[in-house]
């Protein structure tokens, strides 16, 4: 059973593929997710404005949005809130130079939070630089719980409930 479309979106960081092709593909994936009434898992790198404009233009009641491995700005997160987007934190939030991202996640409503590993990349501290693995998600959960002033066990329940609401409701 298909439960989501993605990871898809826009990545203008390396300029490895034509922007227009990326945009067309992203729009097609949004249409498919809406038609199937399943979430779209969105990757956005160096493309906040374009990603937001496309999501806003294509937003409808059947479109459920998950911002995968979210590293966007606080203003980008704020723009996405009316679209009822979910935001997934990766190991990046544990990095000491991620203060802006930590601040952003501290303000995202609990009911819109998820956590992920993005294995084999982006290992959280204390495993930064090593190949990421699923067991390392506990460090991301601990950091996000700290940022949200919650017990880690409560954060895990919240993010599990959010996952189920997003993908199975």
Task: Indicate residue ranges for each PLM-predicted region.
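Short amphipathic alpha-helices and their capping/turn segments at secondary-structure boundaries
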Residues: 1, 99-110
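Short, conserved active-site loop motifs that form the nucleotide-linked donor/cofactor pocket
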Residues: 2, 85, 111-113
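Short, acidic/turn-prone active-site loops that include or flank metal/cofactor-
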Residues: 71, 91-95, 119-120
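Active-site glycine- and acidic-residue-rich loops that bind
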Residues: 88-103
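Short acidic/histidine-rich active-site segments
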Residues: 111-133
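Mid-to-C-terminal alpha-helical segments outside catalytic/metal-binding sites
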Residues: 135-169
């Amino acid at each position: 059973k298909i439960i989501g479309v993605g990871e898809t979106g826009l990545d203008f960081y390396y300029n490895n593929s034509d922007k227009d092709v990326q945009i067309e593909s992203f729009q097609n994936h949004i249409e498919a997710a809406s038609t199937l009434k399943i979430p779209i898992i969105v990757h956005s790198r160096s493309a906040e404005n374009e990603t937001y404009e496309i999501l806003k233009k294509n937003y409808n009641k059947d479109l459920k949005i998950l911002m995968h491995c979210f590293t966007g700005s606080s203003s980008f997160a704020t723009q996405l809130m009316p679209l009822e987007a979910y935001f997934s934190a990766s190991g990046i939030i544990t990095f000491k130079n991620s203060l802006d991202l930590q601040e952003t996640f501290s303000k995202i409503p609990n009911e819109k939070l998820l956590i992920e590993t993005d294995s084999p990349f982006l290992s959280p501290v204390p495993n930064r630089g090593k190949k990421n693995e699923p067991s390392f998600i506990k460090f991301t959960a601990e950091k996000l719980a700290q940022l949200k002033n919650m017990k880690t066990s409560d954060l895990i329940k919240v993010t599990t409930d959010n996952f189920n609401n997003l993908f199975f409701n």
